[in-house]
Amino acid sequence: MALQALNIWTRVILTDASRAAVFRGALQSHCFKCRHGAKRFLLSEDVVKLEEFQQKKLSHEMSQLKDYRFDIVNQKLEKNEIILKTELKTLLHSCQSAEDVIVARNVIKRYHENNRTTAFGEFKFGPLFMRLCYELGLEELAATTIKDPALKGFFSDTTSFNITIDMLFNKQLYESGLEVVGEMKKQGVSLSRDTFMLVFAICYKLNTSRSYHICLTLLEEGQTKGNIIPRRAYCFAIALALKQNDLERAQIFYSHIMSTGTRLCQNLRVFILAVKGSMKEAVYVLKTARISETPVLVRKPEFSREVVNVLRRKSAGGVWEERVEQVLTQLEKAGQITEITLDDLLCYTPSRKRRLLELPQKDRQIKQRTRKSLQSGLLLE
């Protein structure tokens, strides 16, 4: 019932001509347009782990051994012999071309056929194969392989699907990306935080009533199941809602973001306020961001020129025009208006997450002994 009501509500907002007129000026601003050739991956190195994969490949890339390994597995394929786990793992690390990957895929099919009812243990071959496709730029082969009925169950992990979707997004193969998402749900693979972000990014890029409906449906489904929707996913949903002339939904999505202090969130907030006509609030946000006493090493809030141009246009001829122009001039002088587009802010490759360095085992033991002695001393006192 909820999804049915959502479908009806979506059709209403998309066909409401009077509401669309309110946003016409904002859409003409060319906001959210991706610059030509600006293709981005959305997953961080922590997820893709390409560097780690390449380091492991280096230990296997010895030409005289590579040919030998491929000869062995080809002979096993011809004789219908069982492929061992170690052989498949070594083979995947030995692939250097598209032709090698095709052979590896055939070996995977044989391996999966022999081990369909056997658990692979902790090691997952799916992400390894997808990282190989990622490295060699074989996104279409990756998509075809992960949807192959003969390999159902082999790619049982979320990471394999996420890496595939990320590759397809980078090559602007958005419809193929949605097909992979459909296969993911069909196989019962759970959607992770990264999956929601990737799917909403694809829906945002497609910007159609169908993609908007998919975004709304998955968002409702995720919230109903108690999934954690990441901030970046909400930002893509907000951008798509604005492109679909749905200010009400954009505001609702924004209200779900717990921490809105990022540059992207602040730009989206000003954009929403400008389209809404809330000039007083928009000016307050910009005025608050204009902090001349900010230390040199602290990065000042920046706003996209696309966003401030929408604000200028919306305030033109009104009582707030002069005040808007005044605060924008001050921001311009402070270097807080940037040429970076909203699409650039949305579609970026995140940096690797910082991890605290772990102490060696010996140091940890010393710290534990020190802590115990301190506790004993306190008890004696």
Curated annotation (Swiss-Prot):
PPR repeats: 157-191
Record-linked Gene3D superfamilies: Tetratricopeptide repeat domain
GO cellular component terms listed in the entry, alphabetical order: mitochondrion
Keywords assigned: Mitochondrion, mRNA processing
GO biological process: mitochondrion organization; mRNA processing; regulation of mRNA processing
Subcellular location: Mitochondrion
Origin superkingdom: Eukaryota
Free-text function comment from the UniProt entry: Involved in mitochondrial RNA maturation and mitochondrial respiratory chain function.
Family that this chain belongs to: Belongs to the PTCD2 family.
PANTHER family reported in the protein's UniProt record: PENTATRICOPEPTIDE REPEAT-CONTAINING PROTEIN 2, MITOCHONDRIAL (PTHR14700:SF0)
Protein name: Pentatricopeptide repeat-containing protein 2, mitochondrial
